Amino acid sequence: NNTANISDQYVHVITDVFDITIDRVSGNLVSSSLLQYDRELNGNEPLKLLSSTQNRLYVLESGLIGRDGPDNSRNGSAPVYSSAQTSYQMAESENQLEVDLSYTTDSGVNIVKRFTFNRDDYEIGVRYLIDNQSENEWQANFTGKIVRDQAGDQTSQNSMGIKAFLGLVVSTPEDPYEKYDFDDLRENPLNQSVTNGWLAFLQHYFLTAWVPEPDQQAQFQTTRRGPLAVMGFVYPATTVPAGNTVEVGASAYVGPKIIDRLETVAPNLDRTVDFGWLFFISLPLFIVLDWFHGIVGNWGVSIILLTVLVKGLFFHLSATSYRSMARMRAVAPKLARMKELYGDDRQRMSTEMMALYKREKINPLGGCLPILVQMPVFISLYWVLFESVQLRHAPFALWIHDLSVMDPYFILPIIMGASMMLQMHLNPTPPDPMQAKIMKLMPIVFTIFFLWFPAGLVLYWVVNNILSISQQWYITRKIEAQMAEKKH
């Protein structure tokens, strides 16, 4: 039946996670709102990923092209599907919702385009059931495409000038993760045969993807349609003999970048959660953070618990460093005396200082060690906060309503600066005046630097500083008491 009423052009589908619009012309996914994600913090409007408006175009197309395919423009205008209803809603008791669109070709081939939605799932099954009631063999190629304008990323939360990747990722068994931005697609269009691969369009926190059937060979292609980027795949021809029925299709994913979900959709799709070059630290950090969140239910408290855990892992290293610094502080008068005696003879001064350090078991670089060791953890946690959609709009307490962006009132960075100043008082004053000046400026420089960091990261540093100050204060008092005993 090709006389579907064009005034009811759209089929509306609502599940627990989606509010989706399907265009009955060709049966494309032209709009999708993600009901569990707000567009803005404290907003009541869901985040829209797919969209087809005058200002914005980002859709998932699928069709049957080739010799007899109804979506082949040579075979006439695009098919207009009919549906039993114009709106479908997943009932509370349902775990699956199937939406069937029907079309019959002039030659008598019945085509059902079936969309399958599952509860709490962002994967959508797109399948064609082709029943050839004609007298001749029928042949067409299944295709799936991501079609998008080149507008920026509306979901991006810019952090310290770093922007999330916006563009296409293609996965093949030979090259499991290859990125292409719009410039790459323009200069080097893709055209390769792939089996067991996928293609996805990434933005900050969210993605859309097409995943062909396992072991199904497909031609991955990128082209341009005016100002639009077209990224998709085409299967080899599907042949349906007269009187036979054949099924063909693929999976689409329209949703958040969540590792657990993506792992179940396709191999390597979880790599779209890009934790940077320190992923081997970032991933375990995220797993632990997520585990804490499962217990306490607050991402801010989870970050505090993670900080305590990391501090515990580096406890002995920090203790060794703080002992060295406490001894350095205790011998400060001796260093000052040396400066008076050998100030003009730098060589002698250096020799005497090293001898003193050796005698008192002081490592002059000991103070840098805890910070140096923690830097990879700090950088990794930055990527965890930047990339994890779970932390988008995640509140902590009081004025912190979103841990993934900067503190709106700069209170945490100021607390962090104050804690650094307090820590500096516990450290020995460097013998070199220039070095001493630099050390005094450090808390100010760090505070300015941290003003625009995600609040979750500043929270980590504040808690880490408080724990460090407690440990350092205890060790310094202990060493000073021991050295005072030695004198007596």
Describe the role of every protein-language-model region:
Residues N5-R271:
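Soluble non-transmembrane domains of integral membrane proteins
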Residues I22, Y128-L129, A140-I162, G226-L228, ...:
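Helix-loop-helix
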